């Protein structure tokens, strides 16, 4: 899952970062590299806010010069969350289906928590979905979310 980001020099000599697909994800950095890394945090914060508000997290569609590549687990969590919303499945119902405690469900949906892929596979399976991972060649101007 990779989101396009827009970076422009701000009036106070910082770099302003916006995310077209997540308008509430706005950040800045003192340097271009710092701005790129801050974009990861801004995107994850926007995702968590949408979950808190029970809103769908939009799939990345915009194109741009720079991109933020999120961890595969984050993509799985977004897919799980959006599926839960679509199916009207709450956290408690997911916990019952998986025989999990509520903190396990909370961690499975927390984009900043390092969930195991096996737990995400299990959670997606009870919603009727499966997880597929592809390996892609690296391209210039990608920002690795792990570095943040």
Which residue ranges define each predicted feature?
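A short, exposed loop/beta-hairpin motif centered on an aromatic-Gly-Thr core
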Residues: 23-34
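Acidic/histidine-enriched, beta-strand-rich ligand/metal-binding domains
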Residues: 11, 17, 35, 48-49
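Short, charged recognition helix plus adjacent turn
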Residues: 134-148
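N-terminal segment of the canonical double-stranded RNA-binding domain
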Residues: 1-14, 18
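Short, charged, surface-exposed hinge/linker loops at domain edges
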Residues: 1-3, 40-103, 107-113
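Beta-strand residues in well-ordered beta-sheet regions across diverse protein folds
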Residues: 18-20, 28, 134
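DNA major-groove recognition helix of helix-turn-helix/homeodomain DNA-binding modules
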Residues: 118-134
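A short, compositionally biased micro-patch
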Residues: 10, 20-22, 126
């Amino acid at each position: 899952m990779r989101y396009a980001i827009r970076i422009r020099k701000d009036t106070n000599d910082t770099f302003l970062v916006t995310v077209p697909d997540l308008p509430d994800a706005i950040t800045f950095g003192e340097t271009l590299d710092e701005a790129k890394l801050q974009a990861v945090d801004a995107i994850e914060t926007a995702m968590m806010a949408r979950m808190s508000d029970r809103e769908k997290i939009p799939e990345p569609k915009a194109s741009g010069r720079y991109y933020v590549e999120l961890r595969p687990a984050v993509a799985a969590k977004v897919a799980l969350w959006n599926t839960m919303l679509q199916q009207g499945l709450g956290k408690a119902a997911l916990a019952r289906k998986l025989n999990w405690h509520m903190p396990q469900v909370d961690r499975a949906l927390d984009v900043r928590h390092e969930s195991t892929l096996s737990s995400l596979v299990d959670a997606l399976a009870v919603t009727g979905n499966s997880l597929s991972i592809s390996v892609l060649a690296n391209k210039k101007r990608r920002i690795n979310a792990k570095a943040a």
